[in-house]
């Protein structure tokens, strides 16, 4: 775990415990394997692991795919907090409704081609889609 800067096992466990609690990861204990967690808790465990390195940029590819609504909202809240704290959040999703809920700026990519950079000031689905079919 030295790759995360930990040489003190006690400090590491404390940090992991704090991240798991903050993300409301439902598990039997810190030694539980990620594969044994529900899909939503697995996603949150991945975020917890990323948080351990204190990144300045979060690259999220479909981070809420196949998770329940509560987990989805928790992930959105976490990423909003990180963005508000000055971190960059790149959020890739094919769910336009979700993008409109969470994004400040939207880069449209259609069939691998960059189409439009939009500032999300109450954009509608219809407005965004109009740029896709120009």
Model-predicted regions and their roles:
Residues 1-134:
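Glycine-rich phosphate-binding loops of nucleotide-dependent enzymes
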């Amino acid at each position: 775990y030295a790759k995360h800067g930990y040489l003190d096992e006690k400090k590491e466990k404390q940090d992991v415990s704090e991240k798991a609690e903050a993300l409301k990861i439902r598990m039997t204990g810190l030694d539980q394997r990620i594969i044994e967690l529900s899909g939503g808790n697995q996603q949150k465990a991945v975020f917890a692991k990323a948080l351990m390195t204190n990144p300045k940029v979060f690259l999220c590819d479909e981070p809420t795919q196949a998770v329940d609504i509560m987990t989805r909202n928790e992930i959105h809240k976490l990423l909003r907090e990180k963005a508000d704290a000055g971190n960059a959040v790149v959020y890739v999703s094919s769910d336009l409704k979700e993008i409109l809920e969470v994004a400040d700026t939207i880069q449209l990519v259609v069939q691998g081609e960059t189409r439009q950079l939009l500032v999300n000031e109450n954009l509608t689905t219809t407005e965004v889609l109009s740029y896709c079919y120009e």
